[in-house]
Amino acid sequence: MDLIPAIDLMNGKCVRLFKGDFNKRKDFAKEPHEQAEFWEREGAKYIHIVDLDAAKTGSPTNDKSIKKIAKTVNIPIQIGGGIRSQERIEQLFSYGVEKVIMGTSAIENKELVKDLSNKFPGRIIVGIDAKDGKVSTRGWLEQSNIFATDLVKEFSSFKIASFIVTDINTDGTLEGTNEEFIKSILEITDIPVIASGGVGSISDLLSLVKFENSGLFGVIVGKALYENKFTINEANNVLSAERLNDIDLNTNYYA
């Protein structure tokens, strides 16, 4: 299980939202490409990017930052936010992006996801953002009556790379993950799952290690890294396979 640092973009800046609320936004000083480069030096194996402006409006406005990140780092980039067409996906791939995340478009046009996952096998990720178990769309501004678990079951027959599942109620809180939600997803799919939302400490990371053998591939972390709750190097030490035997999951510490 890998830690995947997150860069959320608004107006070309690194930001974090609290529970997905655009009115509760915190800006960070580093330029996005500088932040990505720093995390690569710290030992990140991937970079996760969300274009929040595009997620909200459907129109990409942060391509300059995305291109610069792709040119700056030598590790794979996955990106989501407002990706709703094959043309947009091909454009992002041309920038050097490795994988794309389809969220709103996946829910509104399942056949498109099926076609694109066949055309680009292993490069399409389905992002499912949920509040109280039900899916939210359009940058979390619209709430549906669709259960996240139902969507996961439906998409599990497609040739997608992974699911990214975000619990909106914990996102940006630093108060811990929703383990029951993560478990409910892992129980119904054989496709790798990446969890997002709520990690605020090394203990929170340790609590997820037990899900690795059930298909938890990675965990996305943003605010905790920006606010220096722990470093990527510390996280990698916890999550690396060779340290699993040293971890006491009952007391949440590692030797």
Swiss-Prot record:
Catalytic activities: 1-(5-phospho-beta-D-ribosyl)-5-[(5-phospho-beta-D-ribosylamino)methylideneamino]imidazole-4-carboxamide = 5-[(5-phospho-1-deoxy-D-ribulos-1-ylimino)methylamino]-1-(5-phospho-beta-D-ribosyl)imidazole-4-carboxamide
Keyword Chloroplast annotated: no
What are the protein's GO molecular function terms?
Answer: 1-(5-phosphoribosyl)-5-[(5-phosphoribosylamino)methylideneamino]imidazole-4-carboxamide isomerase activity
* Keywords from the UniProt entry: Amino-acid biosynthesis, Cytoplasm, Histidine biosynthesis, Isomerase
- According to its UniProt record, the EC number is 5.3.1.16
Q: In which pathway does it act?
A: Amino-acid biosynthesis; L-histidine biosynthesis; L-histidine from 5-phospho-alpha-D-ribose 1-diphosphate: step 4/9
Q: Which GO terms describe its biological process?
A: L-histidine biosynthetic process; L-tryptophan biosynthetic process
Annotated active site: D8 (proton acceptor), D129 (proton donor)
Q: Family assignment?
A: Belongs to the HisA/HisF family.
Q: Could you tell me what this protein is called?
A: 1-(5-phosphoribosyl)-5-[(5-phosphoribosylamino)methylideneamino] imidazole-4-carboxamide isomerase
Q: What is its main location?
A: cytoplasm
What gene does this protein come from?
hisA
Q: Does the keyword Magnesium apply?
A: no
